[in-house]
């Protein structure tokens, strides 16, 4: 019927955000799967691409920082607008994008305050940059997947990354010099 998504701080001491997701239209819930997505960080391109969500992307922060070839092709094909940085948002582009959800980031556990400027737009805040371990950052794919009902796919991708990481880590066990 619905899902509750909790976003914890990396030390798991604090709940930073709580999202309620539902496949039905319900007050106070984010309807999933999301149909129109915008991103205020080019870092999220890796998660978007890995989950195959390019077709849902309707706006990005700054095109010059997107390295993903598949996303760049979608940007050109659809003449996707640039939103700019969180500090200097192109308000017209943000409103014209008509995104159902905007991926953004919070600073040190707090939001950027952008949701107060746009109370009718739904923001989902990621804190992957606070992770100190590579697998912690990789695991954020599960967060991005929840809004598209792609949790099983995200779990599979993460487990593959985890296995590869652990195999590579095992190869370096006997390495004496570690820069």
Predicted features by range, described:
Residues 9-23, 27-108:
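A short, structured surface patch at a secondary-structure boundary
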Residues 36, 92, 96-105, 109-179:
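Extracytoplasmic substrate-binding proteins
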Residues 1-18, 111-118:
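Extreme N-terminal leader/targeting regions
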Residues 1-5, 19-21, 57, 120-122, ...:
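Generic preference for hydrophobic/aromatic residues in regular secondary structure cores
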